[in-house]
Amino acid sequence: MDLEKGKKPSEQAAACRIMQVKDKLITLQPVVRACVFLATAVAAVIMGLNKQSYTTVVAIVGTRPVTQTFTAKFKDTPAFVFFVIANAIASGYNLMVLVTRRILQRRAQSLSVHLLDMVILTLLATGSATAASMAQLGKNGNLHARWNPICDKFGSFCNHGGIALVSSFIGVALMLALNLLSAAANSPRSNVTGQ
């Protein structure tokens, strides 16, 4: 019957396989989005609660030591504040899309979600990169600017920041994968007949 219509049976099978692959890509998106939500939420919470105090002796008056307490908080560095905000926005956005995904099934709405996914990916990547540069500065210092490293005194602060950074970069990688899945699922149906 296909030969009467001018189609080859292999073309119809290829079109069916393409639709099956697209269906698998569409069903995989909520799983990846949930993983992005978890990774970015963990990063935002860990960095948002990151605080450590360090007490040291600054002078000795007679026989009595004078101490001073230094505190490292994420709020002290604008890059870490941006990191927390970017991860919070990304986790909130992904949660919102997960909750409303049944409503967003039409192609036009799916394309707007794809465009917003790219914006969130950019926001998340820049937040992670700025925090990583400040974390590197805190760990190694900058000898040319005479900025000493602080991770030898604030070890817990640096460890928690590192965990938050790893979680955020996992979120960036998953968000990139989600963008690729979304682009493949939203691509127009290919012309199998070659016309």
UniProtKB/Swiss-Prot annotation:
Stretches that traverse the bilayer: 26-46, 79-99, 115-135, 161-181
One family name in Pfam for this protein: CASP_dom
Keywords linked to the UniProt accession: Cell membrane, Membrane, Transmembrane, Transmembrane helix
Side of membrane Cytoplasmic, spans: 1-25, 100-114, 182-195
GO CC terms: plasma membrane
Location, primary (coarse class): membrane
Family stated for the protein in its record: Belongs to the Casparian strip membrane proteins (CASP) family.
Name of the protein in its database record: CASP-like protein 1B2
Native organism: Oryza sativa subsp. indica
Lineage: Eukaryota, Viridiplantae, Streptophyta, Embryophyta, Tracheophyta
